[in-house]
């Protein structure tokens, strides 16, 4: 056991986690030169295209150190994006240490801090590594100072490497062996294995990635899942080297996979404990805290026949993504679908893209909303995440919106722009600290503002240099109202949104004008209105297409023309009473992109 090292690789987006992982695999001979693909561990198409890591992946490597001993390194490549921070905390629960990778050109960024604090809270040893020293703008000495100054861990003698060229990779491996402690656990004790991740394979059933904390799990053992109490037989156990490799057993301290032919999707929930069916452990291991979705949106299949396959797809995804929450929803405009909870906008985009790609579904998304706390006049408190579930205005005593604490790191020349943006988003500044060239800003912002387009605008006002991370702090009373869009006097439920009172006029006008552009002209006039309660605050009309009915009259009496025009007018009036308007798909998406 003293030759096992379990560690995660944590870093901000684009600081080179996945490339470093590739390099470590290559160095330890996990794959031949021919099999080395860039970003070996990013196996999803979306991950490769966007160049981001979404799912944490694990790899087991053998490394012959300078002291002549062979060490088993189990490492987990983690995502860097703020939306996937729960993936990071799950991966850390399976390790004893973490490599904090920092780009020697960019320096410390917000996510570096957030992930590092997560690791320190779990009492882990954090080993800083300066990556990308081959870049012309790399300044490792300045960055090492920055790490000590902002993060507060020793970094003067941090390893310097370049994952791209392979310089200093040996040193990284040596540091891992020297500085990260071996796992602790009782090899003789009853089996306790923590499920770090599980996913569904259509041939093998549920594949679970586990970390053995105590005891040994052999192939053919009968084990039970502690939360459900169901028994299964381990058909195959093994490790990823990154290829699936079967082994006869998994020993204490190791990280590997178990396949037990579990066919139902929630048979092995993430964060659960496995133990032997007979003489098993009595206590489960402490799991992970459940992540609460922050953003909700309705997803509807374009053709109603896809509803069943949409539900199956969601079930399969939710096995692999513990943070996904969904419930059925119906909309008069869009039919049957699901209300889905996400961790953030990137998460929402990724899930929608995975559903469309991996399960061939065509989906419509409604505008994302956050959860509001509402105190009704009868004294009870309810939580609403869907604008159409909002009680009538006269039943609402008080509406409270979620406030997030946002930590922003930004170079000082862009500070003014960022402050202007935060003020525009109704933010309250709580802290501002200078660290050399960087400024750390802390703002309390309404989550609804952060969710919509804050990230993109922050990046554009700071030319991409600012970085942020946020967490929910509390609900706070706010003047929020529901803005409805009426088309020909009918409310379209999928276009409703909850917004701040100060923005009603501008938002209402913008929406109405956008709808006017997007809804095709009909044979009769269409009124598009924005309303709050029964008060109309903006309106525009989509003019009817009209046929020139008097074209065939040449000369003759004017009463002839009048008769034809009157006949047309009556027809249009009748049409308007019975006609209904199809709202095109683009109109629903327009709500999301109002600020562009």
From Swiss-Prot:
The tr-type G domain sits at: 2-184
One BP term from GO: positive regulation of translation
Q: Is Protein biosynthesis given among the entry's keywords?
A: yes
Q: What class of enzyme is it?
A: hydrolase
Q: Where are the transmembrane segments?
A: none
- Cell compartment(s), UniProt: Cell inner membrane
For the ligand (GTP), the binding residues are 14-19, 131-134
Q: Which Gene3D superfamilies match?
A: 3.30.70.240, Elongation factor 4, C-terminal domain, Elongation Factor G (Translational Gtpase), domain 3, P-loop containing nucleotide triphosphate hydrolases, Translation factors
**Which SUPFAM superfamilies is this protein grouped with?**
EF-G C-terminal domain-like (SSF54980), P-loop containing nucleoside triphosphate hydrolases (SSF52540), Translation proteins (SSF50447)
Membrane topology type, per the record? Answer: Peripheral membrane protein
Q: Which reaction does it catalyse?
A: GTP + H2O = GDP + phosphate + H(+)
User: Sorted alphabetically, which keywords does the UniProt record give?
Assistant: Cell inner membrane, Cell membrane, GTP-binding, Hydrolase, Membrane, Nucleotide-binding, Protein biosynthesis
GO-annotated cellular components:
plasma membrane
Assigned protein family: Belongs to the TRAFAC class translation factor GTPase superfamily. Classic translation factor GTPase family. LepA subfamily.
Task: Please describe what this protein does.
Answer: Required for accurate and efficient protein synthesis under certain stress conditions. May act as a fidelity factor of the translation reaction, by catalyzing a one-codon backward translocation of tRNAs on improperly translocated ribosomes. Back-translocation proceeds from a post-translocation (POST) complex to a pre-translocation (PRE) complex, thus giving elongation factor G a second chance to translocate the tRNAs correctly. Binds to ribosomes in a GTP-dependent manner.
List the protein's name: Elongation factor 4
